[in-house]
Amino acid sequence: ADYRDIEGKSRQEYNDDAGMSVMLSTEAELDQLVHKMVTAINDIFCPNVEYVGTDLTGTTADGSTFTITQGMKVLDTDNCAVGSDGKLPPQELFSRVGTDRYTEVNVTDAAGNTKTYYVYNEESATDISKMYTLSSLKVNDEIISQPSYIPHLTQDSDNKQVAQQLGTAFTEMWKKNEISLNPNATSKCTFMEYYAQMIGETGTAGSVYNTMSETLNN
């Protein structure tokens, strides 16, 4: 089970599937917690915005044609921080084994000016290797080899100024009530509250089954 067994499911759908099993529901809840935390962290390090405007057609690094359409997510190059190398796109902390975070697209206008867009590679609905899920996550290899590549500087890299807004964003991330344990939950909670609820739910189920076992054995 994974976060897809919770995300977007109605109470009935959940209760007829993963919700019927303590093991499956716990797996799904844990994966949802990881999914939400990982995507929230990556979105702070590598913020996206929706592209607004007419369609743009450019080329990718391998020479393929790529069209950027309205509503696609692209890197917010105006507001993102960078690592010690000062390069765009900045490195995400957690990566999917099946795809990079961005596709680099170079678009040349009628005047011959070229602009680079970093188009976010959305999570696949069917290919697990392209999802931020426990079975296909890893710490970014680039950051493992060079930890200073974690985004932490403003793009005015000559001054090596620390991007203070990142600290504020991470503080706010922990405070937000944006996640529900499962479709049966009546309210949203913070990550810490979610974890406490998940452990409490599993502990309660374990206690019930233990009592049933003891009763049957007596």
Predicted regions and their residues:
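Structural signature of extracellular appendage/secretion-system components
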Residues: A1-N218
